Amino acid sequence: MAAANPWDPASAPNGAGLVLGHFIASGMVNQKNLEIELLKLEKDTADVVHPFFLAQKCHTLQSMNNHLEAVLKEKRSLRQRLLKPMCQENLPIEAVYHRYMVHLLELAVTFIERLETHLETIRNIPHLAANLKKMNQALAKMDILVTETEELAENILKWRKQQNEVSSCIPKILAEESYLYKHDIIMPPLPFTSKVHVQTINAK
């Protein structure tokens, strides 16, 4: 039995191949189940992500785009011919419908302006699931940031309230200290000393 060529990329097993081989060996997955799942997936997404259908749609849109561009190049002359039909040069459209053709040209211009946006939307369809996942992650992070911001705002309000209380107490404390200093009143070092002790010291 010939050894596998180490320089051949096809001979080197990848992670997906090893996992799939393990599932097949354990009996959890077999060839028929894989084929059925692939056929179901291909059937569900054939008209959206299959290259054949995408190529057909892009080709049709490109053909329409080329046709409308060619029409727009003659927009001025077409408008004049529709509004003022001349002998042997007017389009084979009844005169009562000429104004509708002018409106149709305006719609065509609008469609061509938005064509690139529509094509970009079609190209992004295969990446829609990944984009939705990223959007959900961004929304979750935004919710966390909103919660943290609310908590920070509450803390700021509490801190401001405490600062206001401290600021309102400072003049009262200064007035008491000034009064005590003016009358030579010595406050006891212990906070729970009775007023009688203070009066005794003052009497001395």
From Swiss-Prot:
GO biological process annotation, one example: cell division
Subcellular location(s) of the protein: Cytoplasm, Cytoskeleton, Microtubule organizing center, Centrosome; Cytoplasm, Cytoskeleton, Spindle
Coiled-coil features, chain-numbered ranges: 54-84
UniProt xrefs under InterPro entries: HAUS2, HAUS2_metazoa
Family designation: Belongs to the HAUS2 family.
Complex and partners: Component of the HAUS augmin-like complex. The complex interacts with the gamma-tubulin ring complex and this interaction is required for spindle assembly. Interacts with EML3 (phosphorylated form).
PANTHER family: HAUS AUGMIN-LIKE COMPLEX SUBUNIT 2 (PTHR16039:SF1)
Name of the molecule in the record: HAUS augmin-like complex subunit 2
Organism: Pongo abelii
Classification of source organism: Eukaryota, Metazoa, Chordata, Craniata, Vertebrata
